[in-house]
Amino acid sequence: GYDFRQSNRIDKAMAGLRAKLETAYKASGGKKVNIISHSMGGLLVRCFMSMNHDIFSKYVNKWICIACPFQGAPGCINDSLLTGLQFVYGFESFFFVSRWAMHQLLVECPSIYEMLPNPNFEWKEKPIIQVWRKNPEKDGTVELVLYEATDCVSLFEEALQNNELNYNGKTIALPFNMSIYKWATETRRILENAQLPDTVSFYSIHGTSYETPYDVW
């Protein structure tokens, strides 16, 4: 089955999607398939298209994307790496995965690193991270420090340098994983090299004019 934690271009995912396309193609009597992808699923499909261009062209008729983060998901991903994610609040949160537990999981997920903001994209307004930090040179005065989200690896490394998990009496270090980051950088290259076949129709569905704390997208 599909594992959202893994990279969007691992062999198992690519082979699995190919098998499903072939099965659907044969079951329909040789008719091409229409793919509908949502959110990160769009990255998986785009990786497949980039790495298996001829196969994609053979089996796919239309590709419809709904809210796919092709240039990354700065707000969600940066927050995930720094503080984790919390899906449920209030009393219900006692019955769901905690923000801390989710954070420790996401730090080791290749898919999360693959949704860091694209540094090569010409953003209308570059995403930023705001962090309140003590300044030791000013008697510990707390200051608001801004980081461009497309160039904040040093922030992640510093924030997670002492991050660790205790499991079965053992302490496991969970810093910002540079090996995974390098893998994700290669994934970004694969995504950017993707070319839509002339025979495939492409539709991208996304919201516009949504007010955020800094801009309207």
How would you describe each model-predicted region?
Residues 146-217:
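C-terminal subdomain of alpha/beta-hydrolase-fold enzymes, centered on the catalytic histidine
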Residues 1-158, 207, 211-212:
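N-terminal non-catalytic accessory region
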